[in-house]
From Swiss-Prot:
SUPFAM superfamilies: Trimeric LpxA-like enzymes
CDD domains reported for this sequence: LbH_LpxD (cd03352)
Gene: lpxD
EC number(s) given by UniProt: 2.3.1.191
Native species: Verminephrobacter eiseniae (strain EF01-2)
GO MF annotations, alphabetized: N-acyltransferase activity
Reaction(s) the record says it catalyses: a UDP-3-O-[(3R)-3-hydroxyacyl]-alpha-D-glucosamine + a (3R)-hydroxyacyl-[ACP] = a UDP-2-N,3-O-bis[(3R)-3-hydroxyacyl]-alpha-D-glucosamine + holo-[ACP] + H(+)
The protein's name: UDP-3-O-acylglucosamine N-acyltransferase
Amino acid sequence: MSLLLGQIVDALGGSLQGGSRDTPICRIAPLQAAGPGDLSVLSHPRYQQQLAASRAACVIVAPALRAAALARGACILAEQPYAYFARATQLWRQHHAPAPAPGVHASAVLDPTAQVHPTASIGPLCILERGAQVGAGSRLQARVTVGADCRIGARCLLHAGVVVGADGFGFAPEDGQWIKIEQLGAVRIGDDVEIGANTCIDRGTLQDTVIEDGVKLDNLIQIGHNVRIGKHSALAGCVGVAGSARIGAHCTIGGGAIVLGHLELADHVHISAATVVTRSLTRPGQYTGLFPIDDNARWEKNAATLKQLHSLRERIKALEQALKAA
């Protein structure tokens, strides 16, 4: 089922240039792979060379690229082309694969005290334990578990296999064995949060683990007990956040990175993939803590040198002092 360019512009705004509102769009496609019935996007000026060769019926571009876009055909001018593209994908999904109707699937298991908003959707084999709450317009896909007293805000999307409110990892040592610390807190998830498949968010020990409004979590993420993640932060796949860490608002954490427990990240901190965050970061900025990849022989030599870095530094300082004294 196609959409007309006019329908897209009417729904999303922007300015259609050099094309007809009646042009049918059959799919949304990457710039270099797009065909005559496709809508595409030029998300960054560095891809401008692909623009002239693209066969797309229409391309979403920034106003600064209007002339280059019109030289090849129709375009939609948008101040933020990538955000416009994102909304176009949402519009496409609404027309071609609408969200499930509100309600609770017959195979879901809900404690009698669980509360589900009438506009929420609970998918197959979901479990909502005692006192769990799901807010307006939220969607839980298959096999999501929401533990006792945990709360999901409005318009959230939890993908298959998410577990909210499992016990945090808390044990006290005594005489060579471990004594379990019961996790008496819960999890509070704000509005407009998306949580990827098989991600786990542990309940707090005494206070709640908190995921604030607009946070986006990828697949296979582990969020430890008592963690707090600030508004509109985004964490990529396989990130691990240890207990009691606090991540500010508008932060990003790349795939496979680890944040150690009890650390604090300021607002607007950006962590590169595979970085291990070992100290609190109080200033906004991009941080990387990764030994660069190399062929194995060179890597081993560099690693061996790194182990001796302190002694080499002391030798250089001694040489500098000797030269000054000479």
